[in-house]
Amino acid sequence: MSETNERNNRHVYQGRVVSDKMDKTITVVVDTYKNHPVYKKRIKYSKKYYAHDENNEAKIGDTVRIMETRPLSHAKRYRLTKIVKKSI
C-alpha cells in the first residue's frame, strides 16, 4: 500500500498557533461547533493539540494544518503539514 493511500484516513485539523515556546513543538487551538441536543443552537468550542514542528517554522498567530501521526511523546500525536496563513 502506498504512503499516500495510508495517510488519507488520518485526521487533519486546521487551527491557530497559540504557543511556540517549546523546541520543535507548537500548541494549536482548533475551533469547532456542536449542536446543543435540546435547544439546537450551535455552540462554539475549542480544543488544544500539541503538534510536532521539525524546523520551528510556525509562529504565534499562524493558521496551520496538522495531521494525526504516531505518538511522538507523552502529549504529541500530530505533526505540522502546512502553514496556511502567516501572521503579520
UniProtKB/Swiss-Prot annotation:
Keyword tags: Ribonucleoprotein, Ribosomal protein, RNA-binding, rRNA-binding
Gene Ontology CC entries for this record: cytosolic small ribosomal subunit
The keyword Cell membrane belongs to this UniProt entry's keyword annotation: no
Name of the protein described by the UniProt record: Small ribosomal subunit protein uS17
InterPro entries cross-referenced by the UniProt entry: NA-bd_OB-fold, Ribosomal_uS17, Ribosomal_uS17_bact/chlr, Ribosomal_uS17_CS
Lineage: Bacteria, Bacillati, Bacillota, Bacilli, Lactobacillales
One GO BP annotation of this record: translation
CDD domains in UniProt: Ribosomal_uS17
Function: One of the primary rRNA binding proteins, it binds specifically to the 5'-end of 16S ribosomal RNA.
Similarity comment: Belongs to the universal ribosomal protein uS17 family.
GO molecular function: rRNA binding; structural constituent of ribosome
Gene expressing this chain: rpsQ
Domain of life per record: Bacteria
Pfam family of the protein (one): Ribosomal_S17
